[in-house]
């Protein structure tokens, strides 16, 4: 009887987390097995989406989806996204770190697990090497979010950059988790960005908005640093008069 009750509790917990990620329509009689297979399939598709949206190259980056309160599914290490199959997706206990898969899971699995432990509101995580965010991360700068709509989605008025930690290390995990501060993304010093969401679609939305915010930030910094590059009204007028005098037409 105790085993039956325990199993029902796990299934109930899994249903709630699965609903957050995919909606209650995805639930069936064989919840645990069907939800895990659905999640694995979703991760395979998400990997192709990473490439299509220019967020990573080759085998860079990684993605995970929460299965339930204790488990997550995460992409493998060292396999091209075009070649990832459902059996390559690891199921990992976010408390013990134990995992099951035919291949090694991502080297950043501990980072994903730590975020899920700290943030019960998070259902999916995407680690990217997107251009603008990676430039800001390499410069190790915090990025102001001046667009209110973007700030609402990112849940932050400033995107913080973590201290440096080598890939796959406890230091990287600790530094990254410490700067999330309840927000939906963070920059990882010299290592790209991490974007969160209640589901995989929201995590991708966060990554796109982060890229736009970082692009605006960089453009403003470049403009401020190069005032001489801005054309003065006098020079614009002189160019106009020169073109007019030469008889040239646009």
Region spans (language model):
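Cationic, low-complexity basic patches in intrinsically disordered or flexible, solvent-exposed regions
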Residues: 9, 13
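Residue-identity detector for glycine
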Residues: 14, 23-28
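Glycine-rich flexible loops
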Residues: 27-250
